[in-house]
């Protein structure tokens, strides 16, 4: 689950139990070692694991130097168990702010050690195929890391595609899945990975097993707020988002208005019908309008190889002296490439990415371009075929 290394302990179960229980007794438990050895002698291994499980909270009294190694030893002892009933007891004993070991120099150091132990537990459980325990362990690690300022320890895993795979494939309760998605999303935002966070929501909403109405609304809200999202195509293509047309009409209308770059409509919504929606969702009306203008400019550039400043100003409803700034913003958003000419008062378009839903007219334009491309290819093939036939005829003539 993380890049943290963990100690591998070797030896027979009897030796490992003797070492672990002897240490636990020093923390305040009498006769644990003797009771466990008697159970082992009687062939009652489950009894041994039960006895150790009952004393797990004592391990949090370990010194900073011994805490992680003794927990790793404990996990190794449990690896001899045929069941995984002990997992919940481990999570209960080590998780939560109140269970942080007090021997460490502050919560950050203690949290780092706890996350390391939970990472080892997660790796152990990866072969058990118990999705619920894996999810609960990951939740515990995320909670501890967040509370103690150690999210960076899990950054590598959280940023990987494997995290999305877990969420989409684990057979777990819906409320647990929602908690997990919320925790991972929050962690990615705190790790300054807004694009990854949004991709997580897109994947979750796009999966019928994980999609929920609140999550769909959150996806739309975060996409509209994001400084990095200008192409809403993948979001609008999701069926749960399309369903908002009937279940959350105002939010859906706001989404499609911004995504299509409809500046006049956005101005109208911000001043009227959607004013309360914008306030309720903590949207910034000016930011939404700015995003709409950037998308509008990209769509305008996709329709013409060169655009006069006056046309840009009219379509974006901005002053002529700010046109170049809007073009620069659109270039920075990755939607267009081109060259500004102050002399000609125009923008020469080299590349433009049209945003928003694909309308019937867009498909017709695409179809026309494909027809032209197809005709050009056929013309080239005809020329090549004719040249080949002429070459073969010339060879036959020479041979004769």
From Swiss-Prot:
**Keyword entries, A-Z:** Cytoplasm, Initiation factor, Protein biosynthesis
Indicate where this protein resides in the cell: Cytoplasm
Q: Which domain of life is it from?
A: Eukaryota
Please give the biological process terms from Gene Ontology that the record holds. Answer: cytoplasmic translational initiation; formation of cytoplasmic translation initiation complex
Q: Which InterPro entries match?
A: COPS7/eIF3m, eIF3m, PCI_dom
Q: Which segments constitute the PCI domain?
A: 180-354
Principal subcellular localisation of the protein:
cytoplasm
For this record, the Gene Ontology CC terms, alphabetical, are: eukaryotic 43S preinitiation complex; eukaryotic 48S preinitiation complex; eukaryotic translation initiation factor 3 complex; eukaryotic translation initiation factor 3 complex, eIF3m
Q: What's a Gene Ontology MF term here?
A: translation initiation factor activity
- Cite a single Pfam family from the UniProt record: PCI
What is the purpose of this protein? Answer: Component of the eukaryotic translation initiation factor 3 (eIF-3) complex, which is involved in protein synthesis of a specialized repertoire of mRNAs and, together with other initiation factors, stimulates binding of mRNA and methionyl-tRNAi to the 40S ribosome. The eIF-3 complex specifically targets and initiates translation of a subset of mRNAs involved in cell proliferation.
Similarity comment: family membership: Belongs to the eIF-3 subunit M family.
Q: Which PANTHER family does its entry note?
A: COP9 SIGNALOSOME COMPLEX SUBUNIT 7/DENDRITIC CELL PROTEIN GA17 (PTHR15350), EUKARYOTIC TRANSLATION INITIATION FACTOR 3 SUBUNIT M (PTHR15350:SF2)
Its subunit composition reads:
Component of the eukaryotic translation initiation factor 3 (eIF-3) complex.
Recorded protein name is Eukaryotic translation initiation factor 3 subunit M
Q: Which organism is it from?
A: Yarrowia lipolytica (strain CLIB 122 / E 150)
């Amino acid at each position: 689950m993380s890049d943290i290394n963990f100690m591998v302990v070797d030896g027979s179960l009897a030796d490992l139990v003797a070492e672990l229980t002897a240490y636990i007794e020093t923390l305040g438990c009498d006769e644990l070692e003797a009771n466990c050895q008697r159970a082992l002698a009687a062939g009652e291994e489950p009894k041994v694991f039960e006895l150790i499980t009952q004393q797990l909270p004592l391990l949090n009294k370990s010194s900073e130097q011994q805490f992680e190694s003794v927990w790793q030893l404990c996990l190794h002892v449990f690896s001899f168990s045929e069941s995984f009933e002990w997992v919940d007891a481990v999570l209960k004993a080590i998780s939560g702010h109140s269970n942080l070991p007090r021997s460490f120099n502050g919560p950050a150091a203690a949290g780092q050690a706890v996350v390391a132990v939970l990472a080892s537990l997660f790796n152990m459980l990866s072969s058990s195929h118990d999705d619920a325990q894996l999810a609960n362990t990951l939740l515990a690690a995320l909670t501890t890391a967040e509370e103690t300022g150690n999210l960076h320890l899990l950054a590598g895993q959280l940023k990987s595609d494997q995290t999305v795979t877990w969420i989409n494939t684990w057979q777990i309760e819906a409320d647990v899945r929602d908690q997990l998605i919320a925790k991972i999303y929050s962690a990615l935002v705190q790790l300054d990975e807004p694009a990854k966070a949004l991709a997580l929501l897109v994947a979750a909403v796009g999966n019928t097993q994980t999609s929920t109405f609140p999550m769909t609304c959150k996806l739309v809200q975060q996409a509209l707020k994001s400084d990095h999202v200008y192409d809403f195509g993948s979001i609008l293509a999701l069926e749960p988002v399309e369903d908002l047309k009937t279940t959350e009409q105002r939010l859906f209308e706001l989404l499609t208005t911004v995504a299509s770059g409809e500046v006049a409509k956005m101005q109208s919504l911000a001043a009227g019908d959607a004013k309360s929606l914008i306030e309720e969702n903590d949207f910034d009306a000016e930011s939404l309008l700015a995003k709409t203008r950037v998308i509008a400019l990209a769509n305008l550039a996709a329709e013409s190889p060169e655009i006069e400043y006056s046309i840009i100003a009219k379509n974006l409803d901005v002053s002529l002296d700010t046109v170049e700034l809007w073009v620069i913003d659109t270039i920075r958003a990755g939607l267009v490439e081109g060259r500004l000419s102050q002399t000609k008062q125009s923008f020469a378009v080299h590349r433009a990415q049209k945003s928003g839903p694909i309308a019937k007219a867009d498909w017709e334009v695409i179809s026309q371009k494909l027809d032209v491309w197809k005709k050009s290819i056929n013309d080239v093939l005809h020329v090549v075929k004719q040249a080949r036939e002429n070459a073969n005829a010339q060879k036959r003539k020479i041979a004769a």
